[in-house]
Amino acid sequence: MTADVLKALPPDVRTLKLSGHVGFDSLPDQLVNKAISQGFVFNILCVGETGIGKSTLLETLFNQKFDFSPSNHDLTDPKLKAVTYDLKEANVKLKLTVVETCGYGDQINKENNIKPVVDYIDNQFENYLQEELKMKRSMQAFHDTRVHVCLYFIAPTGHSLKSIDLVAMKKLENKVNVIPVIAKSDTITKSELQKFKARILSEIQSNEIGIYQFPTDDEAVSETNSVMNQHIPFAVVGSSEEVKINGKTVRVRQYPWGSVQVENENHCDFVRLREMLLRVNMEDLRERTHGVHYETYRRQRLIEMGFRDDEKMSLQETYEKRRELQRKELQQKEEEMRQMFVQRVKEKEQVLKEAERELQTKFESLKKTHAEEKKKLEEKKRFLEEEIAAFERRKQLAEQARQGNLTMKKRK
């Protein structure tokens, strides 16, 4: 099979027709296989009042029972809890991190309710940045906890957005992809819901709040996303209760007057949210988090560290240059430490040699003293042996003289 060559090339690039199969047409398959083997990461932040249905909606979205501990209304300050799960669907692995607010909106003074949320998002950006700045970094092994999407839960009042909602979404707009959802939308009528949606969009636009819009520049999904953008904010219902209707198991919320089917688009926008969030635009959320929100944070932090854009050099070039300087400084420090270590080793060797010489001198002195003492003892021994020999000779002479005297006496 002959590979096709793209024709949209600059004029100075030659177009060649392959005479046979080469094999680089398998590159997309290689990328897909590599991505599947590594798995994917997706992090969701749910911001909303206590008991508004955050946990239930997440469990409905992923058709999975999560171990969420219930929150209470007694917290003095809002807190966040994050739980990570490893999910698998058709050999595709997903490391899902779910972050929920606890005690959000329960305080009398709600002025700083959103601060812990903003701090959490910034902390995840900072963790990723510090990993990037390491001399020996391993981004593939690093667990990326940057928030890819924030589902902002709006209470179904049917009137308008609360001031806390406007302030919160305004502070989050440049840090995370914000998707507003109307929680427990089955508690208001259809006509009220449509008016409520229109009022929410009007207030968001009048306050110039930037919420996430599904991208329409990709021809493959532009039509679908354009239609779905008109349904924002999504009116959702979550439920873990399942019943059989016409022989089919469906998730519902049952009331004395009837039931609401979670996955019925005539009843709520849950299916639309799931389609847009997980099945169509998950990768765009991930890319936008990295390419827009994280880059904004990264640029600001690098400027704080002393990296600045100028006419001659871009921020990225400045960053790379400063990183290269840091690498050289580190190498220089390593060389200085090595030289210092070598010098200390030499000094220690010199001390050991001096001590060895002193020991050798003492050994030679003791050896000489020992030889002299030995010589003296040998001389004393020789002198004593000579005295003993002389004594033996005198003794023999005396004995001979005594024998001679005895012989003469007998003869007389």
UniProtKB/Swiss-Prot annotation:
Print the keywords alphabetically. Answer: Coiled coil, Cytoplasm, Cytoskeleton, Glycoprotein, GTP-binding, Magnesium, Metal-binding, Nucleotide-binding
- Give the highest taxon in the source lineage: Eukaryota
Localized where? Cytoplasm, Cytoskeleton
Tell me the GO BP annotations in alphabetical order. Answer: protein homooligomerization
> Which stretches are annotated as coiled coil?
308-401
The glycosylation sites are 405
Residues covered by the Septin-type G domain: 38-304
Entry cofactors: Mg(2+)
Name the positions where GTP binds. 51-56, 100, 184-187, 192, 238, 253-255
Question: Mind telling me which Pfam families this protein's record contains?
Answer: Septin
Please describe how the activity of this protein depends on temperature. Answer: Temperature-sensitive. Stable at 15 degrees Celsius. Starts to aggregate at 37 degrees Celsius.
State a GO cellular component annotated for this protein. Answer: septin complex
Specify where the region named G1 motif lies, as residue ranges.
48-55
Q: Which CDD domains match?
A: CDC_Septin
Q: How and how many cofactors are bound, per the record note? A: Mg(2+) is essential for the GTP-binding, but GDP-binding does not require a metal cofactor.
User: Which stretches of sequence are listed as region G4 motif?
Assistant: 183-186
Any one Gene Ontology MF annotation carried by this entry is: identical protein binding
How is activity influenced by pH? Stable at wide pH range from 4 to 9.
Q: Which InterPro entries match?
A: G_SEPTIN_dom, P-loop_NTPase, Septin
> Domain annotation text?
C-terminus (307-412) is necessary for binding to liposomal membranes as assessed by phosphatidylinositol-4,5-bisphosphate (PIP2)-containing giant unilamellar vesicles (GUVs), models of biological membranes.
According to the record's subunit comment, the protein's assembly and interactions are: Septins polymerize into heterooligomeric protein complexes that form filaments, and can associate with cellular membranes, actin filaments and microtubules. Homodimer. Homooligomerizes. Forms (via GTP-binding domain) heterodimers with SEPT5 (via GTP-binding domain) in a nucleotide-dependent manner with GTP promoting heterodimerization most efficiently. Component of the filamentous forming heterocomplex composed of SEPT10, SEPT5 and SEPT7.2. Heterocomplex formation and the filamentous polymerization of the complexes is enhanced by forchlorfenuron (FCF), a synthetic phenylurea cytokinin.
Say what the protein does: Filament-forming GTP-binding protein. Lacks GTPase activity, which is likely due to absence of an essential threonine residue important for hydrolytic activity in septins. May be involved in membrane remodeling, potentially by its nucleotide-dependent cellular membrane association/dissociation ability. Able to bind to phosphatidylinositol-4,5-bisphosphate (PIP2)-containing giant unilamellar vesicles (GUVs), which serve as a model of biological membranes. Self-assembles into ordered cage-like structures on the vesicle membrane.
Q: What's this protein's family per the entry?
A: Belongs to the TRAFAC class TrmE-Era-EngA-EngB-Septin-like GTPase superfamily. Septin GTPase family.
This chain belongs to the protein called Septin-10
